[in-house]
Amino acid sequence: MKNESLTPNPSPKGEGSKMKNQELRTFISAKPMKNENYSNGEGKIYSSFYILHSSLTHAFLLASICVLTALFIPTPLRATDKIKSGGTWNDTSGSFINAHGGQVIFVNGYYYWFGETRKTSVSCYRSTDLMNWTRLADALSPSGSMTDDNKDIASGRNLERPKVAYNAQTNKWVMFIHWENGSDYGQAKVAVAQSDKVQGPYTLVDVFRPNDHDSRDQTIFVDTDGRAYHFGSTNMNTNMLVTLMSDDYLSPTTTETKILQGDKYEAPTIFKVGDTYFGLFSGCTGWDPNAGRLAYTQDIMGEWKHYYDDMQNYSYGENFCKDEGGYTSYTSQSTYVIKVEGKENAYIYMGDRWNSGNVASSKYVWLPLSVRSGYPAVRWYDAWDLSVFDDMYRYKRAKNITDDGEYLLIERRSDRVLSRKNSFTLENDDTTQNVVWNIIKTDNPYEFKLRQVSSGKFLESVFGTMRLQSESDRTAQRWRFVLQEDGYYRIENAEDGKCFTVSGSSTYVGTTVFLNDPDLKNFRSPAHQLFAVYFDSYKHSEYEEADLFSREYREENRRKIEEFELAMSIEAPKASTMDGQRHDPTVVYDIYGRRIADSLSQPLKQGIYIVGSKKYFK
């Protein structure tokens, strides 16, 4: 029998119900209501009332089935054009996306999303735009049975935080999983599986503890040279273990190190920009969210560093979330950083908003991640799309300061621009508020004058406050730029020594910037007093951009810092003692006493020199 309720209704609005009501009235009027009997052809007699009752009951049951079908069978969804964090996400069939603690990678025109399902399987979804996801078959399904040696992925085991990596030598895809026995978290092992295809199916290879270390929250990172490194929380989450994997990625080598010791980090997420490795982590608070942590290095097996400030405890690293709600990582925990294909330095923070009562129903937090400041910075967006990356890097770090050039100052922790409304504040990129400065050189290579381009007035320290004044020869209009290894500066007034300071060490929009004494009690230059010089690449494409993430950039800055500190501490040596030569008042020496040039008429790099027993700044 054809179910007309599943057939598209071609009638104008309202006509369908009108026609059905008329048909029902006709049906009722055509049937004798009593004293008439009908045979079903098999000798059974039915009254007209019974026939009517049966027909109506049948129609009601069919209608009920249709309603239930509509409620429980997913309906294909319209295409999604925005990413909305913290909500319920469905795939293209209308089913809830279940892929937690996972990863997204780009392969041959598609993004593949892997995640745990809490059903001893690893799900896999596919998309071309990171917004509309199609469910594929499980990448990894339960296999084997629970055995004493725990070498299985049988139903009932816990498989968490799946990550996959392609091995170019074997032409195989390898999956890494945090493996537990299903009853507790005491096993702390790694399961490794392998497949010929990125989407699977993956087959279990082994379950082990890396070199007999416990390993819980984990990830895999493949470097540009093809080497794979496994990161896992170890020593009951006290330290982070980094293990170099074998050439086929299937087993650990004995090359290992423990990083961030004592910091109690979990949920590791590792990615690389240039020569710099970044790690995003969380603290250990169970299913509850906490402030994200940031660490970095240029030697993956060496020392990992993080910045602190006086507002944070030593067990906390720098938080990569910059807006309100960042103290809980926007109610999420890190799981991966997605590289957006076809866009330079475009990354997405990928996090889980856990529901401990029903982990499978946990939600997702995906947000744009910027590295413009030289460090990962994640801001909150209610809804966004990939166009957010179009202007993300409009302001670029200046390699050099050109005399009288036009620049902006960006604060390190917030990745926000020094701006001016009624006072100096930190704001998002906004050409109507961001202050553009002419940075004007003086006779001291470390001191500059700052002229606001729009008003032509100069920044001056007036009774310890930041004021824009007409130009003068006052020392209070000179600003010393004290360089840091990462290219940031402590900007301090040449007269009173007070420096740019962020109120309350806040990273929020609208935070006040004021002058305060350098906070050097525990740190040479704390993070909340550091700014870097940027330029508007839309207006000044001729300016040269600094290579923030290269080894050479930091090495050159360290050299400049050494030169600056030496210059500030030494007295000019007597020229007669230099290089054993007879005194010549025109010869140019560097601060180490090495002969550089015969006279100042020769080209010299910026720096400090000794000429005729006197310091010369260029």
Where are these regions (language model features)?
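C-terminal outer-membrane/trafficking sorting elements
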Residues: 21-46, 50-53, 57, 562-618
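Lectin-like carbohydrate-binding module/patch detector with strong preference for beta-trefoil
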Residues: 396-549
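Coil residues (strongly favoring Ser/Thr
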Residues: 92, 430-431, 599
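Bacterial N-terminal signal peptides
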Residues: 59-71
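Carbohydrate-active catalytic/glycan-binding domains of CAZyme proteins
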Residues: 79-406, 434-438, 476-480, 534-548
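Residue-level signal for tight coil/turn positions that link beta-strands
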Residues: 101, 108-109, 168-170, 224-225, ...
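Intrinsically disordered, low-complexity repeat and linker tracts
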Residues: 77, 540-583
